[in-house]
Amino acid sequence: MTPKKKEAVDSLHYETQHGQAINCDSLEYMKSLPDSSIDLVITSPPYALHFKKEYGNVEKHEYVDWFIPFAKEIKRILKDSGSFVLNIGGSYEKGTPTRSIYQFKLLVALVEQVGFHLAQEGFWYNPAKMPMPAEWVTVRRIRIKDSVEYVWWFRIIIR
């Protein structure tokens, strides 16, 4: 079935018999949704990168505080039987060949502050991913290309 485009006030909106895809400010949109009304939220938010992207991204030290409002809204709109799946990539510490742990700090905050349960973790293997940071991977060759990202599956109630 070909998705049909549906006009929306401030977003691109596609709908099929299987669900909807909405392109908008997700935090504002979630605020308009009723409690316990969604079965599944899948997201891959902007990563904490060293260089600014046109679509916007925050620094590693701000990342958890930036994402928590989204997580609280996701928890509010999820049904008790619902799932939240988060894809998040890693990052290096600026100027050093060492990895940041910002995504693990987020994982702990999602469980301890927001109240999600980590149901399962998975890994997305992306061999086409760019070799970043270039200084450590392609120039000095002291780190291998990072071709894996985390995919975390959260639940509110574990069954």
Language model segments and positions:
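Core catalytic lobe of class I
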Residues: 2-159
